[in-house]
């Protein structure tokens, strides 16, 4: 009585790549005066959320970071949220 070992081969799981929310026809423009938009990309502690979480492209992430920093400098956004 020989036992046949069958290994179960699983297909690899590929997570679908998210698209950049700032690319496309109806995409919002990144502006330092648009506080509601900028607050979506700031964590609860006031830090800028990385692009691997928000799926923002590298170019738009730099623009977003500069807009957040400019809004902080002008007093529109806080540096730290307590």
Curated annotation (Swiss-Prot):
Keyword tRNA processing attached: no
Matches recorded under Gene3D superfamilies: Ribosomal protein S18
Keywords from the named record: Ribonucleoprotein, Ribosomal protein, RNA-binding, rRNA-binding
Pfam families xref list: Ribosomal_S18 (PF01084)
InterPro entries recorded: Ribosomal_bS18 (IPR001648), Ribosomal_bS18_CS (IPR018275), Ribosomal_bS18_sf (IPR036870)
Molecular-function GO terms, alphabetical: small ribosomal subunit rRNA binding; structural constituent of ribosome
Gene Ontology CC, one term: cytosolic small ribosomal subunit
Region of interest: Disordered: 1-20
Gene Ontology terms describing biological process: translation
Subunit structure: Part of the 30S ribosomal subunit. Forms a tight heterodimer with protein bS6.
Function, in words: Binds as a heterodimer with protein bS6 to the central domain of the 16S rRNA, where it helps stabilize the platform of the 30S subunit.
Similarity comment: family membership: Belongs to the bacterial ribosomal protein bS18 family.
NCBIfam families associated with the record: S18 (TIGR00165)
Name the record gives this protein: Small ribosomal subunit protein bS18
